[in-house]
Structures are given as structure tokens and as C-alpha cells.
Amino acid sequence: MNNFVKQVASKSLKPTKKLSPSDEVISLNECIISFNLDNFYYCNDGLFTKPINTPEDVLKSLLIMESFAYEKMIIKGLIKILISRAYINDIYFTPFGWLTGIDDDPETHVVIKIIFNSSLISIKSQVIEYLKPYNVNNLSVLTTEKELSINTFNVPDSIPMSIISFFPFDTDFILVILFFGVYNDSYCGISYISPKERLPYIIEILKPLMSEINMLSDEIGRTSSIRIFNSTSVKKFPTNTLTSICEIVYSFDESSFPTPKTFTPLNASPYIPKKIVSLLDLPSNVEIKAISRGGVDFITHINNKRLNTILVIAKDNFLKNSTFSGTFIKENIIWKGIYTYRIIKSSFPVPTIKSVTNKKKICKKHCFVNSQYTTRTLSHIL
């Protein structure tokens, strides 16, 4: 989490007022939750590499997670339970490694690092009860020897600034980080999460309280920092205590602030839902609209209907040098015994399969080769 905040805030000018810690210190313990998923078979040995873990890497990891719908459901449900009882430090899942930080790879499919100051017995019982229906194995819920002491600070007279991004551990929420000053090498402030649909309300609430509001915008394949608001005339933020910026996040309580009466339209979003798709899986003989941005080609409309989830195109070698920017129509075919597709019409240049003649139209199968019943999974013909 610390690495994520550092990366998100790296391009913003933050307050540099020197703060002095108060006498109060927040003491926290670390807990590691780990388990294997039953009947989960996956291996990326010799292929996987992720040296930095930028916000773009985090968004890519969340995109990869969409390809594992069942596993995502389990992990996301557990995260929602933990958010109400502890602070999430990081998540590990075999296909994408550590979600926000850099660490050694564990031996289990899933690891969740949390820090907490409540009862471990209560947390452990909730975890065990939640995972019971999913037949996970090698479940471990253990505290480490790592103890964290988080300094607290009184709110200074300096004007804070805010950065808003997606919350990496649950994209149903946004992360709101307020920066007030520095202590030693650490920035000090307070962090909140709020349901993503409350973003316009949060911005309007913060405007009279911040010198500047920046938002990390998801632009599919890249991110950018957008300045939403800046001012020199602000009111004092209604909180008494700050901490070093860390894993500690609070739920944003809108009832502590006046209700906004107007809202500024936003043409950007911290997180855009997306899913990887093969062109083979798209419907045949209908118009499809695609856009290319930041080296990523993605689909926004099918048959003149706007999609709720952006579809990121997974290209094969045949189309690796083509840029999907415009409209196209495709059809699935059996070509030389292979189930594939061809683009039959497009507003942009693409290579074509000249001949699709196949009298027998027999497709090579990966298994069940003697069966007269033929179909495909997402990966195989059978």
C-alpha cells in the first residue's frame, strides 16, 4: 500500500511544512492470511516479471484478475470482510504476484497482508467461516513478529492538498489521500475510502478545504494526474489527528460536512472496468467499435450498443501489427482445421485470410477427438 501511495502521489506537489509528532502513538500488529484454492491450476514460471509495480501495473493486475472470475469472487469477498476489521497492506495472487508492492513470492496461491489493532481471534474466526464453503486448503492466519508504531500529529495551520485514486484492494471504492506536511522522510495526513459513486460528492466537499485536488485518471493502458481544483481560500479541515501516510484508511463520513448543492461534471474516472477478450469470442457479423490508446486496443461498442465494461483486445500474431481504431465486422471460420476468425470489413487496415474454402469443415480438437459433439471453451476445442 505504501508503494502504491508513493507512486500515485509522485507527480503532485505536496505540502512540505515540518510537523512534530504528538505523544500519542498508534500500535499495530501484522497478520498474514494465506491459502491455496482448490482445483486451481495455473503456472507462469519462467515468464512472470514485474520489477516496479506502478499504478499502471496495478491496473493491469486488476484486469488480469477479471480472467479468474471464481477466484476473484472469493478474494474480493474476503477483502470486504477484512476492510471492516483491519487495514490491508497488500494482496498476492499467483497470476499477478503482489498487487501493490514488491516482495518475495510465497508458496500459496493467495496471500493477504493486514495490519490490525483489534482481536486476532475475531478476525481469524471470520476468515475461517467465510472461506469454509470454498474448499480452500493450507489456510493459515498468523501474526508476524512485525510491530508497527504509527506517529500521530496535530492538524497544522497549513493548507492540505488531496489526491484521489482507485482503491487498489477493492475498486468499488475510491481512495482519498490528504497531505498536510512532513515528518522526517514521511508525508503526514489522513486517508479515506468511499464508494466510487460518491466521487462527485467527495470532490465538492473537499473543494472549500483543499488548496488543490488531483485525481489519478484511468486512461486504459496508462494513467495521468488531473488537477480538478485549486484555491488559496480554504476552511480548516474538520479533524484533530493526522498520521504518517500508511495503510491506515478510514471510511469517509459525509455527515461531518455540509451537503454539496452543485456538482462539477467529470470527464475522467479513477477506474474503468475492463476485461481481456479474444476476437474469437466476439459475435460474428455485427459492427464492433474499437479505440487504440497508450498501446492498448479496446472495444467500446458492439452492434451500436455501448458496453458497461471495456473489452481489451488480446491480439494473436496474425494481427499483432494492426491498430484497432475504428469499426470492423468479423466472422468465425474453420481454416485449415483451425477454428479462427477473419475480419470481413474494417475502417482500418488489417491482414486478411484470402481463402476460407474447407469442404469438410473439420476442426482439430484438443481432446474428445472421437466425439461427434463439438464446441469450445475459452481456451480449447473439444
Curated annotation (Swiss-Prot):
Record bears the keyword Nucleus: no
Family: Belongs to the orthopoxvirus OPG082 family.
Membrane-crossing segments per the record: none
InterPro entries: Poxvirus_F5/I6_dom, Poxvirus_I6_C
Name of the protein described by the UniProt record: Telomere-binding protein OPG082
Species of the source: Variola virus (isolate Human/India/Ind3/1967) (VARV)
Keywords recorded for this protein, A-Z: DNA-binding, Virion
GO cellular component, one term: virion component
GO biological process: viral process
Induction or repression: Expressed in the intermediate phase of the viral replicative cycle.
Pfam families, alphabetized: Pox_I6, Pox_I6_C
Location relative to the cell: Virion
MF annotations from Gene Ontology: DNA binding
Keyword DNA-binding attached: yes
Record's function text: Binds to the hairpin form of the viral telomeric sequence. Might direct genome encapsidation into the virus particle.
Top-level taxon: Viruses
